[in-house]
C-alpha cells in the first residue's frame, strides 16, 4: 500500500509550522492519524511534538559550533549529512503505512534550486519507501498584496513545483493579518489572478527599462498556470478542511486506504 506524505514549503516566517499544527489538530478532530516529520535542523519548539526529527541525527547549532560555519553553510552540511544517512530516515519512518506524514521543511530556497537536496529526498521517498507525495507552498497574504512581491513569491513557488516534480498546492497564509478593508478587497484578485493584468500595476511602479522583463515574468507564470492560491485561516476548521481535501485529492489518499472490516459487535437483530 502506498504511503502518503505532504511537503510543507515556503520562505521563513510564512507560517509553515502553524499550518502543520493546524492540519494535525484538524485530522485528530476527525479521527485521522498524522505525524510531523521535522526536516529543519534549526527548528524551534511547536505545539505538537515531532514524531521524527532531523535534530536527533544532526542539528544546525552543533554544526555551527563544531565547524565554525554560518547558518546557510551549516544547513547545507546538515542536509548533505542526511543524504549520506538516508537509512536513518528509513528506519525512523518505519511502519507508518496508513497515516499521513507531514514534512516540515526549512525555508531556504537553495535546498532545491542551487543543490538537489530536497529533490533527492523526494525521489528516495517515492522510489524506496513508496510514498504518494504532494508539495504545499505557503506565502504570507500581507506579502503578496504588493504586486511585485506577488510575482517574486509566484516564481519561488514555481521553482519548487518544477524542481520537485510533485503535485503542487499554493496557499496564502496569515489572512488574519490583512485587516484593512481596502487590502482585503485587493487580496481577492491574488487568489486566482491574471498575471498579465497585474503587469500594468507593476509597470506603474518600475523603471520603463524593466517593463519587458515584467511582461516576460508575467507570461511565464501565466503559461505554467500555477497562479491559483488557496486561502488559509489556521484557526478556521472549514478553511483547514478545504485545504486538506485538496491534499487528499492529489495524493489519492482515499484510494490508498484498506477496506474496513465489518464491526462484528453488531448483532443481526440490531440492524
Swiss-Prot record:
Pfam families: ATP_bind_1. The keyword rRNA-binding does not apply. Signal peptide: none annotated. Keywords: GTP-binding, Hydrolase, Nucleotide-binding. GTP binds at residues 13-18, 173-176. The record marks 72 as: Stabilizes the phosphate intermediate. InterPro entries: Gpn (IPR004130), Gpn3 (IPR030228), P-loop_NTPase (IPR027417). PANTHER family: GPN-LOOP GTPASE 3, XPA-BINDING PROTEIN 1-RELATED. Belongs to the GPN-loop GTPase family. This is GPN-loop GTPase 3.
